[in-house]
């Protein structure tokens, strides 16, 4: 029985993870559930899954949860960053699902890595922000990091076994790999008139044609910033160069990514667009378990199409690729600016097309400095957020 900590238990990845646990109750136990402040959702999860620990980032939410839990349930309720770092490092913890959205997920994810845990990485921002520090921590602790994002999980499945065992230090060329082909659907605005993009609403941006996701990642998909963040994540996970990484627009989301080999072969991982598949793969690797997902019906798939990304339509993707080339400081600034600009768009404060403008402004105006510690990263993250907030206020 593997005991799991689920960071971001009340989110979409958390729900999918718990669904896979339900499919395999003899093998997995939700040992600790972690959320920000969604007390109602956490209460329901506690009653259903009876974890040993329920942790709320927000202290007031933790106090409310403690009051509302049935008296007969022996669930320890906690709050605070230090307490969370201690939870993921507990000796009885076998596996940590890192699914807290955004920069907020970095400290706990890094704590799990430093504790040498098996970490299922769904928080791409951890690598986007901390890059080399994250990889060094992983290698220094012998933590096993497995990628949950459907694209990176697909790439991982298409790699030869020695490369799978060398996450963060892969020798792609030595493994006979010429390119990693990172696929993305293009989101809901792939064929929209360019002049109409400035008028798109948050609800329109969140109507992804294939995937069911949270609102922040849905907007990132609409702008293809999500693919840009995944590009940066792939650079670190697979030790890839700019020449080895390519983005391919694939509207059907059937092929989740591909690996191209020097002999002309291309290996692709395919499946229905359901996050339970990569989650189950990571939970059981190198074995396979039931995910509760219907198998792909090739007779219903129909046409598969592929396009080059249009940077006029998706300027955020270009910003991310360029930031990745510039280095860790630029990707940290970009991630922070994007979180602020997307939040502002969802709140109705700026237009959809302003997201890229705010991000570009911060990349060119925030003073970048060397990032040697997690404190350096969080300080630069704070600077970029303030710059983005000031820019949003002027739009």
Swiss-Prot record:
The gene is dxr. HAMAP family: DXP_reductoisom. NADPH binds at residues 10-13, 37, 123, 125, 214. Its cofactor is Mg(2+); Mn(2+). Mn(2+) binds at residues 149, 151, 230. One of its GO terms (molecular function) is 1-deoxy-D-xylulose-5-phosphate reductoisomerase activity. Catalyzes the NADPH-dependent rearrangement and reduction of 1-deoxy-D-xylulose-5-phosphate (DXP) to 2-C-methyl-D-erythritol 4-phosphate (MEP). It catalyses: 2-C-methyl-D-erythritol 4-phosphate + NADP(+) = 1-deoxy-D-xylulose 5-phosphate + NADPH + H(+). Its EC number is 1.1.1.267. PANTHER family: 1-DEOXY-D-XYLULOSE 5-PHOSPHATE REDUCTOISOMERASE, 1-DEOXY-D-XYLULOSE 5-PHOSPHATE REDUCTOISOMERASE, CHLOROPLASTIC. It comes from the Bacteria. The keyword Thylakoid does not apply. Pathway: Isoprenoid biosynthesis; isopentenyl diphosphate biosynthesis via DXP pathway; isopentenyl diphosphate from 1-deoxy-D-xylulose 5-phosphate: step 1/6. This is 1-deoxy-D-xylulose 5-phosphate reductoisomerase. InterPro entries: DXP_reductoisomerase, DXP_reductoisomerase_C, DXP_reductoisomerase_N, DXPR_C, DXPR_C_sf, NAD(P)-bd_dom_sf. GO terms for biological process: isopentenyl diphosphate biosynthetic process, methylerythritol 4-phosphate pathway involved in terpenoid biosynthetic process. Belongs to the DXR family. Keywords: Isoprene biosynthesis, Manganese, Metal-binding, NADP, Oxidoreductase. 1-deoxy-D-xylulose 5-phosphate binds at residues 124, 150-151, 185, 208, 221, 226-227, 230.
